[in-house]
């Protein structure tokens, strides 16, 4: 499976096909990647479908995919790696979007600790983390 082609096809679908067809494409491609044990592709596509479900306000599906993604990350022993932190940041953002503030906060802390061990202090990854973290505090109405 070619991830670049999969993502190009996915991107090309927006504006030309229905949201249902786009979701079906992601689900079917995730299933195929699992069948072929292409877990790097599975992780990428689970991140994509979490964002898709977040943007289309499909809470139950998003949370199910968040759980599945976290299980795969642990199964593959990716804890402490940057790609693990990136996926957790995506999950934390989904949790925040659906009002699971404490769960989101816990994941932001894990992402920060991972970044402290893996990236330079001035790395742009921190900007994304802290921007999303600040949105969490705003939504929690915690301004202190």
Task: Explain the meaning of each model-derived region.
Residues 103-106, 110, 142-144:
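Structural signature of tandem alpha-helical TPR/SEL1-like repeats
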Residues 35-38, 75-79, 117-121:
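Short coil/turn linkers that connect adjacent helices within long alpha-helical scaffolds
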């Amino acid at each position: 499976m070619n991830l670049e082609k999969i993502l190009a096809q996915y991107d090309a679908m927006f504006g030309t096909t229905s949201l249902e067809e786009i979701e079906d494409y992601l689900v079917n491609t995730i299933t195929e990647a699992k069948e072929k044990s292409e877990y790097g592709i599975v992780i990428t596509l689970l991140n994509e479908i979490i964002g898709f479900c977040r943007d289309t306000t499909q809470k139950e599906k998003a949370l199910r995919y968040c759980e599945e993604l976290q299980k795969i990350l642990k199964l593959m022993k990716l804890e402490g790696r940057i790609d693990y932190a990136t996926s957790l940041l995506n999950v934390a953002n989904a949790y925040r979007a659906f009002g699971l503030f404490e769960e989101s906060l816990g994941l932001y802390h894990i992402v920060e600790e991972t970044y402290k061990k893996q990236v330079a202090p001035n790395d742009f990854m921190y900007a994304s983390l802290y921007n999303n973290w600040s949105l969490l505090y705003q939504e929690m109405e915690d301004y202190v």
